[in-house]
Structures are given as structure tokens and as C-alpha cells.
């Protein structure tokens, strides 16, 4: 989240860092400042607290099953570098980088946040076709 907001004013970055620090310590933040509710609303805080307990690279190392790491090249929330770190931690995993795919598994020609949000909010846009075919192939191969 902090990476995603790195272009925001320092006061916003500091506020986000403070909230994240509390959540990482397992503490709920009852009074989220105006404008931060979408990211840190009360209903999502328990999930975030549980999420911060895990190191994805460590977790993936421990898996004893076939792993497919799927990453959209136009995802503005989880970066290609994050997927590459997972692959490095689990060399036997399959890494699938998909052109134009964003965080909600749809095609988006840009990483512009406003255009991404329009794609996020458009239920008529289909899931990326490469994802569907690749996921199907991976499952069939591993049966």
C-alpha cells in the first residue's frame, strides 16, 4: 500500500505508514482519517492484520504442490517484481506474466490509476483470455 501511495504528499504517506504500523502490530485503528476509509475501513482491518503475519516468499517455499504464479504486467497493486521474488523463492513454480492484465484480471492498456479504476469498475469487461487458457492448461497438465 505504501508503494502504491508513494506519489502522494508526505503527510498522506506518513498517515498510511502509521496506520500500517499499527496493523502490523495486530492493533485495529478505530478512527481512520477521512479519505483513508476505502483502504483501511473497519471491515478490512482484521484481514490486513492476518495478512501482515505472513512472508509470501517463505510461505511459497514450503508448498509441496505445483504452483502457478500469475502476474499482470499492468497490475498497479502487485508488481512484476513481487511475482519475480516469489519465483526466486520457489524455482520449481511456473511464472506467468500476462501483457496488459491488471489486478482484477482484466485487460488495461495503461497503468494510469484513473483508467485502471474505470476498468476495475466495469463489470462488462471480460477476464483476460490468456489467463483463462493458461490456467486451464496448467490444471490439465498437473492432473
Kindly give the residue locations of the regions a language model identified:
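Accessory cap/linker subdomain of secreted extracellular hydrolases
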Residues: 1-50, 54-57
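Solvent-exposed, polar/charged alpha-helical surfaces in well-ordered, non-transmembrane soluble domains
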Residues: 58-61, 84, 88, 133, ...
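Short beta-strand/loop motif that positions the catalytic acidic residue
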Residues: 63, 69-71, 75
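Acidic catalytic loop of the alpha/beta-hydrolase fold
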Residues: 74-78, 103-104
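Short alpha-helix in the alpha/beta-hydrolase fold that links the catalytic acid
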Residues: 65, 78-89
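Catalytic active-site module of serine/aspartate enzymes centered on a nucleophile-bearing elbow/loop
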Residues: 94, 101-143
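A structural signal for isolated positions on well-ordered beta-strands in alpha/beta enzyme cores
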Residues: 68, 94-96
Amino acid at each position: 500500500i505504501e508503494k502504491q501511495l508513494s506519489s502522494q504528499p508526505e503527510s498522506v504517506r506518513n498517515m498510511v505508514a502509521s496506520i500500517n504500523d499499527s496493523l502490523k502490530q495486530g492493533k485495529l485503528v478505530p478512527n481512520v482519517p477521512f479519505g483513508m476509509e476505502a483502504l483501511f475501513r473497519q471491515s478490512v482491518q482484521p484481514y490486513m492484520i492476518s495478512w501482515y503475519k505472513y512472508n509470501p516468499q517463505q510461505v511459497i517455499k514450503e508448498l509441496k504442490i505445483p504452483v502457478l504464479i500469475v502476474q499482470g504486467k499492468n497490475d498497479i497493486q502487485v508488481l512484476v517484481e513481487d511475482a519475480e521474488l516469489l519465483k526466486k523463492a520457489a524455482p520449481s513454480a511456473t511464472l506467468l506474466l500476462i501483457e496488459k492484465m491488471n489486478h482484477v484480471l482484466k485487460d488495461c492498456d495503461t497503468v494510469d490509476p484513473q483508467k485502471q479504476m474505470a476498468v476495475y469498475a466495469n463489470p462488462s469487461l471480460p477476464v483476460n483470455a490468456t489467463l483463462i487458457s493458461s490456467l486451464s492448461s496448467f490444471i490439465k497438465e498437473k492432473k
